[in-house]
Amino acid sequence: MSEISQDGTVELDLSGLKCPLPALRTRKALRALAPGSRLAVTATDPLAGIDIPNVVREEGAALEALERHGPVARFLIRRGADRPNAQA
């Protein structure tokens, strides 16, 4: 489920979802954002620490922060100007 915080960051809680769902939903959410927008993703899947940074790179976005608290990882992502391989 996603929400928008007071600073305009889209909050996406993917807790409890297993691979590949956190990566797929992160990609979908990033593609729906306007360039320069921020996305905060919370995930508990151990593979999210590998998969989500790869999605961020593939989408031409920037991983601004990664916080871990036990099994919970929180990713702060800024969408780039455009996806590197976007088709017109």
Sequence positions of predicted segments:
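Amphipathic, hydrophobic secondary-structure cores in small proteins
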Residues: L14-E67
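Short, compositionally biased "basic patch" segments
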Residues: M1-D7
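C-terminal structural segments of small proteins and small subunits
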Residues: P53-A88
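Conserved beta-strand core positions
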Residues: V10, L39, A73-F75
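Short amphipathic
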Residues: D7-S15
